[in-house]
Regions:
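Compact beta-sheet-dominated domain cores in extracellular/mature segments
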Residues: 1-215
Length: 215
């Protein structure tokens, strides 16, 4: 993985390199990911420029290494964008530790992935709330915070989040560690009213670090 990432953790539903691209964004090469069935870029290989809701439908038993050439992506543990989610920014992911980072959750392969289209590192704003439904103490952020408590947030919990622009990845623990939650302006209108909106696998509202997604 790159040192930059270490400093921070109507169209067809999917398309491989043999399928036509259907948008200006894709025709400009905005998104491209290469996946392999085995670790260290071995075994069956395919390139994608659009979402893939089920890698098994493309002949893969699993995906165990990845190279992101353009754009940020999200990888999911299960088909149809289910299970734990992992941010995939530009760079090499030769094995599962590369995308899971310091997560306590061991996910050795991925089975679906999609693009993050609203990421804008230079224009990202998010508001954190103490209580559900955007109530209680709030704090607006425009930068990366490896420790929310060091920044002044008084709790280990963030009960609701409103993404005003860009895309963010929130982490369970300080230092961009633990479970990852991808928060996007163009999903759910940027409104995450309770912690179960963060992810289908979110078990609590514990969030202690957050950063902008690179694009």
């Amino acid at each position: 993985m790159s040192t930059e990432r270490e400093r921070r953790s109507g169209a067809p539903r999917y398309a491989g390199k043999d399928l036509p691209m259907t948008s200006h964004m894709e025709s400009m090469g905005q998104f491209k990911i290469i996946v392999w069935e085995e670790e260290n870029f071995q075994g069956k290989r395919s390139e994608f420029m659009m979402e893939c809701p089920n890698a098994m439908e493309r002949g893969f038993r699993k995906i165990r290494s990845i190279k992101v050439e353009n754009g940020p992506w999200i990888g999911f543990e299960y088909p149809e964008y289910q299970g734990q989610q992992f941010i995939l920014e530009k760079g090499d992911y030769p094995h599962w530790e590369a995308w899971s980072g310091n997560s306590a959750y061991r996910t050795e392969n991925l089975l679906s992935f999609r693009t993050i289209r609203c990421a804008n590192h230079n224009d990202s704003r998010v508001t954190l709330y103490e209580s559900e439904n955007f109530q209680g103490i709030k704090f607006e952020l425009t930068d990366d915070y490896p420790s929310l408590q060091a920044m002044g947030w008084c709790s280990k919990e963030v009960a609701s989040i409103k993404v005003l622009s860009g895309a963010w990845v929130a982490y369970q623990y300080p230092g961009y560690r633990g479970y990852q939650y991808i928060l996007e302006r163009d999903r759910q209108n940027g409104e995450y009213r309770k912690y179960t909106d963060y992810s289908s696998q979110a078990h609590s509202s514990q969030i202690q670090s957050i950063r902008r997604i690179q694009h």
